[in-house]
């Protein structure tokens, strides 16, 4: 089977993406390093409010470079509000990024510090657009909550997700994943940084308002190993474990990172 036109190895990885996706060198690319001394406290930022209905959880899919947990997004049962937003954004997915070792794996970094993994909870602007497809490339189309994951204690809240990975070992496999509220994965404090950015993998649309939580969540070494044991090949092909899927940080290019705290 033909390999996708992008991935995370030397031949098709982040250094090569700009050949096919010139926006890779754009002015609003993600992830970034958050330099805390250069962030700007903004009193106009409201608290983040998430209201997710567990009944909207739908399925888990191995997409070859990661796995996605997808949600029903035909109505506003699961939404993100507040923060920098005047519109409500509808939940459609969460996924993770990780590295080949526990020393790195997050996409965003804080004062240069790399975390072991990163959770992304993704939403689209259902107040202005009629579908994810329509919203995905628009400047105000997407809102993603990023949560840094620090290696340490096992995180019991991840267990249902990890238990589901057995059923989606290889690329293209999918399985039902129901009755789950991803707000249970968020840290207890929703203090956040926010900045205008992009999807962190192709097509790299500069359509994401990022909400990066100040507080991290825990993940154990064994739990990270379960992420890496997923395979990026289709069933029957040689086993190629998903060792890493994190893009390096991109230059801020004059953007301001605002802080809610």
UniProtKB/Swiss-Prot annotation:
Residues that coordinate or bind Zn(2+) 2? 65, 68, 201
Residues annotated with N-acetylalanine modification: 2
**Mechanisms controlling activity:** Activated by histamine, imidazole, L-adrenaline, L- and D-histidine, and L- and D-phenylalanine. Inhibited by coumarins, sulfonamide derivatives such as acetazolamide, benzenesulfonamide and derivatives (4-carboxyethylbenzene-sulfonamide, 4-carboxyethylbenzene-sulfonamide ethyl ester, 4-(acetyl-2-aminoethyl)benzene-sulfonamide, 4-aminoethylbenzene-sulfonamide), and 'prong inhibitors' BR15, BR17, BR22 and BR30. Activated by a short exposition to Foscarnet (phosphonoformate trisodium salt), but inhibited by a long one. Esterase activity weakly reduced by cyanamide.
Which parts of the sequence belong to the Alpha-carbonic anhydrase domain?
4-261
Keyword Acetylation on entry: yes
Give an example GO cellular component term for this record.
extracellular exosome
Record localization: Cytoplasm
The record's annotation in InterPro entries points to: CA_dom (IPR001148), CA_dom_sf (IPR036398), Carbonic_anhydrase_a-class (IPR023561), Carbonic_anhydrase_a-class_CS (IPR018338)
Name the SMART domains for this protein.
Carb_anhydrase
Query: What's this protein's function?
Result: Catalyzes the reversible hydration of carbon dioxide. Can hydrate cyanamide to urea.
Task: Name where it mostly resides.
Answer: cytoplasm
Which species expresses this protein natively?
Answer: Homo sapiens (Human)
The reaction(s) annotated as catalysed by this protein in its Swiss-Prot or TrEMBL entry are: hydrogencarbonate + H(+) = CO2 + H2O; urea = cyanamide + H2O
Which GO molecular function entries does the Swiss-Prot or TrEMBL record give? arylesterase activity; carbonate dehydratase activity; cyanamide hydratase activity; hydro-lyase activity; zinc ion binding
* Enzyme Commission code: 4.2.1.1, 4.2.1.69
What is this protein's name? Carbonic anhydrase 1
Asked if the Swiss-Prot or TrEMBL record annotates the protein with the keyword Lipid metabolism, the reply is: no
Q: Which UniProt keywords apply?
A: Acetylation, Cytoplasm, Lyase, Metal-binding, Zinc
């Amino acid at each position: 089977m033909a390999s996708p036109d992008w991935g995370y190895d030397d031949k098709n990885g982040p250094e090569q993406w700009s050949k096919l996706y010139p926006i890779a060198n754009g002015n609003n690319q993600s992830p970034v390093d958050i330099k805390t001394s250069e962030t700007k406290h903004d009193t106009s930022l409201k608290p983040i409010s998430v209201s997710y209905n567990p009944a909207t959880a739908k399925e888990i899919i191995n997409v070859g470079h990661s796995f996605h947990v997808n949600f029903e997004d035909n109505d506003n049962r699961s939404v993100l509000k507040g923060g920098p937003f005047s519109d409500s954004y509808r939940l459609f997915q969460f996924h993770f990024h990780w590295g080949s070792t526990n020393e790195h794996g997050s996409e965003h970094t804080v004062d240069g510090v790399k975390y072991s993994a990163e959770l992304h909870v993704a939403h689209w602007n259902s107040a202005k657009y009629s579908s994810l497809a329509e919203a995905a490339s628009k400047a105000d189309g997407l809102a993603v909550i990023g949560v840094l994951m620090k290696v340490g204690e096992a995180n019991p809240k991840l267990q249902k997700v990890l238990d589901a990975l057995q059923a989606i070992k290889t690329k293209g496999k999918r399985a039902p994943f129901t009755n789950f509220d991803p707000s249970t994965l968020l840290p207890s404090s929703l203090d956040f940084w926010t900045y205008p950015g992009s999807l962190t993998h192709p097509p790299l649309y500069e359509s994401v308002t990022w909400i990066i939580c100040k507080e991290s969540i825990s993940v154990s070494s064994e739990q990270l190993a379960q992420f890496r044991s997923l395979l990026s090949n289709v069933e029957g092909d040689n086993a190629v474990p998903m060792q890493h899927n994190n893009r390096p940080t991109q230059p801020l290019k004059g953007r301001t990172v605002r802080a809610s705290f």
